[in-house]
UniProtKB/Swiss-Prot annotation:
Protein name (Swiss-Prot/TrEMBL): Peptide methionine sulfoxide reductase MsrA
The species this protein was found in: Mycobacterium marinum (strain ATCC BAA-535 / M)
Function: Has an important function as a repair enzyme for proteins that have been inactivated by oxidation. Catalyzes the reversible oxidation-reduction of methionine sulfoxide in proteins to methionine.
Source superkingdom: Bacteria
The enzyme's E.C. designation: 1.8.4.11
Active-site feature positions: C13
EC category: oxidoreductase
UniProt-listed InterPro entries: Met_Sox_Rdtase_MsrA_dom (IPR002569), Met_Sox_Rdtase_MsrA_sf (IPR036509)
Length: 171
């Protein structure tokens, strides 16, 4: 049996990100928190330069990192710096926090495909950085939209959105 793998993604308010990602095939568990910033023991009221992020545990036999990233780019706008919908500020930036060189390679390759696809109107501004500490958010933020199904979100699945792979040299 293959061990579960982890991904850490930020794409705006973590409530909507978690709610959609948790429903994807192969996702075992999710939790929301703060990552990519400068404050130890980050909290909602004091998270410094951290982004609101989702930690995803997934079964690599049921899904892969690339598939998770494709979904990530479908449910948030990666072309708006420090913003998703009405949410503004560095907390709401688009970011991929990779855990190893392979995740970094897949992230950069997926971003190149997003850029080449023209599915988004502008240049992708998604930050790609090594994963640092992930500070779990307070209990009231975990599984928020499961507890409050009509709660706030600015994330949605875009029907018919399919990321093509770009043609690369040597194919």
């Amino acid at each position: 049996m293959t061990s579960p793998q982890k991904a850490i993604l930020a794409g705006g308010c973590f409530w909507g990100m978690q709610d959609l990602i948790r429903k994807q095939p192969g996702v075992i568990a999710t939790r929301v928190g703060y990552s990519g910033g400068d404050v130890a023991n980050a909290t909602y009221r004091n998270h410094g330069t951290h982004a609101e992020a989702v930690e995803i545990i997934f079964d690599p036999q049921a899904t892969d990192y690339r598939t998770l990233l494709e979904f990530f780019f479908q449910i948030h706008d990666p072309t708006t710096p420090n913003r998703q919908g009405n949410d503004r500020g560095t907390s709401y930036r688009s970011a991929i926090y990779y855990l190893d060189d392979e995740q970094k390679r897949v992230a950069l390759d997926t971003i190149a495909d997003v850029e080449a696809s023209g599915l988004w109107p502008g240049k992708v501004v998604t930050e790609v950085s090594p994963a640092g500490d992930f500070w779990e958010a307070e209990p009231e933020h975990q599984d928020y939209l499961q507890r409050y199904p009509s709660g706030y979100t600015c994330h949605f699945i875009r029907p018919g959105w399919k990321l093509p792979r770009r043609a690369t040299a040597g194919q």
